């Protein structure tokens, strides 16, 4: 993810770093590369136009002209504007209620059912929650079986009923959670091949009956620009509180992450990093911008390493990776520890 975008942005940054001052000509040349890089990464055209105009305007400002290191200032402007696109970083969930209720929605095939298991697993580990999963996708028997299988793998109870009234199942499931002392409820809802009225009416009814604190749309980042229409389609009917972008570790160009929040106003809460049950991570704009600009996501490296090595060694490893100084022995050392 972002490899091509990172390379092209680095080229643009290096052009400015090689100049003594920023001028209309050299900034226009650099911004042309930035514009093409973003478009090739599948960032929305309107977003690209607005972004490049703002960067150019700031780069030609008086403070930048006075700078002894215009390349560094240009890099900071790029970073600040990318952060503006991605949002303020408020990806935290509202877990203040007892039980806290999270309703997951999405199109058929978006990976909603597996994601609900990943989210329950994450919140149990990170927040110490006791989750209950509710199987309210009554139109696809395989979805209920899949959720039950996930529940067995994770040792998390799944609430299901033999009836086909999804609204009633959700309502009964929440009551069951209260009786049994669960402090977190995650509701798996039905998906469709496209946004339709029947789907939305059912989701609106569930929302009205159980009043979830979070309504999160699960979306496959591989669908690119179509993601914007899907987010807006759901958000027009439901008060979405966030999105989960799946398959951000795959062949996706990543443009949807840079377009979605800016165009829809719906924050990204989590991103999918693998198909494994721990392959979900809280979205952090600072980290993503760091990756885009070629600095690497050092904090993620450290967090992953801390599970098998101590903090001091993790920091040393991360610094080596950032500086490009890791040798074969370093890699072999981490590989040996990861399989212990």
Please state what every model-predicted region is.
Residues 9-136, 143-163, 169-179, 183-189:
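Primarily NTPase-proximal linker/entry elements flanking Walker-type ATP/GTP-binding cores
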Residues 1-7:
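Generic start-of-chain signal for non-secretory N-termini
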Residues 170-173, 182, 194, 198-208, ...:
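Conserved phosphate-handling catalytic cores of large alpha/beta enzymes
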Residues 339-340:
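Conserved small/polar residues in nucleotide/adenosyl-binding loops
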Residues 138-139, 163, 189-191, 221-222, ...:
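Conserved Walker B
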Residues 39-43, 63, 83, 191, ...:
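Amphipathic alpha-helical interaction elements
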Residues 14-21, 34-38, 58-65, 287-289, ...:
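Short hinge/gating elements
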């Amino acid at each position: 993810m972002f490899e091509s975008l990172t390379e092209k942005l680095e080229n643009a940054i290096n052009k400015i770093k090689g100049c003594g001052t920023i001028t209309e000509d050299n900034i226009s040349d650099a911004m042309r590369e930035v514009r093409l890089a973003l478009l090739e990464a599948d960032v929305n055209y309107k977003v690209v136009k607005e972004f490049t105009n703002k960067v150019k305007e700031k780069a030609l400002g008086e403070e930048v002209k006075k700078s002894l290191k215009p390349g560094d200032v240009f890099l900071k402007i790029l970073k600040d504007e990318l952060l503006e696109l991605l949002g303020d970083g408020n990806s935290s969930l509202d877990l203040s209620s007892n039980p806290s209720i999270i309703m997951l929605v999405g199109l058929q095939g978006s990976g909603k059912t597996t994601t609900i298991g990943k989210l329950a697993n994450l919140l149990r580990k990170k927040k110490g929650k006791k989750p209950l999963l509710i199987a309210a996708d009554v139109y696809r028997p395989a979805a209920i079986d899949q959720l039950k299988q996930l529940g067995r793998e994770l040792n998390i109870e799944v609430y299901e009923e033999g009836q086909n009234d999804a609204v009633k199942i959700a309502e009964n499931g929440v009551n069951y959670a209260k009786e049994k002392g669960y402090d977190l409820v995650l509701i798996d809802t039905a998906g469709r091949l496209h946004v339709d009225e029947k789907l939305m009416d059912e989701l609106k009814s569930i929302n009205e009956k159980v009043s979830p604190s979070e309504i999160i749309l699960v979306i496959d980042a591989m669908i690119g620009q179509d993601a914007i229409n899907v987010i807006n389609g759901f958000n027009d009917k439901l008060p979405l509180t966030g999105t989960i972008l799946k398959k951000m570790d795959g062949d996706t160009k990543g443009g949807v992450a840079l377009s979605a929040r800016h165009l829809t106003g719906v924050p990204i809460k989590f991103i999918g990093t693998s198909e494994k049950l721990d392959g979900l991570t809280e979205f952090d704009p600072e980290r993503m911008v760091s990756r885009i600009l070629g600095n690497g996501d050092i904090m993620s490296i450290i967090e992953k390493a801390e599970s098998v090595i101590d903090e001091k060694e993790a920091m040393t490893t991360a610094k080596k990776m950032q500086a490009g100084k890791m040798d074969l022995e370093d890699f072999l050392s981490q590989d040996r520890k990861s399989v212990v």
